[in-house]
Amino acid sequence: TPEGYGRVRDIETDPDLTVIDAIIANGKIQNMDAILLHLAKMKATHGEGKLYASLLTNVDFNNAFATAKNIQNKGLLLYGPFVRSGTNCSRFVAAVIKASGPSFIKRIRLKYPFCISPSPKRNVCITNHHYYVVENQKCIQVKKSKWKAYFSSIEI
């Protein structure tokens, strides 16, 4: 993409993006560690350093997916955290989460972030106070109370 622009990618548009199918039993993803370790290794899905991830349950997947595809179908997008009417990875993720129908509090926290623009870590901690950190080929699950997660750093 040209300088200052980005685009939404998926396995149809970028063959180097691969995903591991979730194994679900009793309503829970059984291979979450394997999925996250795979994503953390891929330069196409993750920059450098720790990977943070969380799960959002009870969502409208179809609406979230349609929102992601609608943004993707726009083609090249102005890219940057402070670009008006533009996007970046965190803004894209926040838009898709909002479209999934989260609770009122989560929608408000996503719409009005503490910082000027959504950030990856903020999206993770808004989504769930139980989250994952992947570093050095290890996947750690962090469980905090809602209160502690709201007022403390996501760092472990």
Please provide the spans of the model-predicted regions.
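Non-catalytic ligand/cofactor/substrate-binding and regulatory segments of enzyme domains
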Residues: 1-78, 141, 146-156
